[in-house]
Amino acid sequence: MKKHIKTIMVVIAGAAILIGGIWGINESRYPNVPAFDDHFTRKFLNKDKKVDDGFYEFKSKTGQYTIWFPEEYQLLHENEQQYVKNDNFYERWKASSVNKHKRGDQLNYLQVNLSESNPDDESIYVESLFKGEFGANDPEKWETANTRIYFDAAYLYFKGTEEHVIHDKNKHAPNTYIGYVADKHSNKVIELWFDDSLNHQTNKGLEKREWFVEILNSIRFNQENSST
């Protein structure tokens, strides 16, 4: 009986080692960065396509677009409201990076919304977005071969319940970045928000601006599904 129990224990131990080895091999196939440490996030990423320093290609589950995803970020998915998808025309996700800070752990958030919008009303949507967030509609605008991009950034803070906005980058580095990207060949649009809560230094503002603009420029809509 003891010999039988010992045999069973040896078999169990061997199986555990084998399973652990297989798991280790599977995990080693992924890049050693936070984005791939999360099993949900990695489902969207191409591990073989590091598109630039610090970014991997993210492919939407709608099949409508790809975007550069920062390797130090992970998608939030603790509840059904943090990642939302409706057929192939709407998707909303939020990703965060946790950094150590002398004030404690704080989060930087990146949120991306895919939806559809009438191109004829683009100026109305753009004004509503930027005026609603910053109290002014004066975004930068540029174009790529296939997209129109609007961008602005400012420092937002509250005094009591009243929100204040500082647009002057020399007075304070922005902590809120917003982008609006419209596909030239369809009615697809993407709105992006970046909440840079950890940014307390004016000289870091330019770095974050360049980082966010890289993400805006990286968006590629799926032209096979385009329809106006």
Stretches found by the model and what they are:
Residues 2-93, 194-228:
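N-terminal targeting sequences that direct proteins away from the cytosol to non-cytosolic compartments
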Residues 47-49, 57-58, 74, 82-84, ...:
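Short, exposed beta-strand/loop patches in secreted or surface proteins that constitute
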Residues 57-59, 66-68, 74, 111-115, ...:
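Ser/Thr- (and often Asn-) enriched beta-sheet segments in non-cytosolic proteins
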Residues 59, 111-117, 163-168, 198-206:
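Second-shell loop/turn segments in exported
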Residues 68-74, 102-104, 150-153, 181-189, ...:
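Short, solvent-exposed coil/turn segments at beta-strand boundaries
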Residues 91-127:
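A short acidic-to-branched-hydrophobic micro-motif
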Residues 119-123, 171-174, 201-212:
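Solvent-exposed, acidic/flexible segments
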Residues 124-185:
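Signature of long, low-cysteine stretches enriched in small and polar/charged residues
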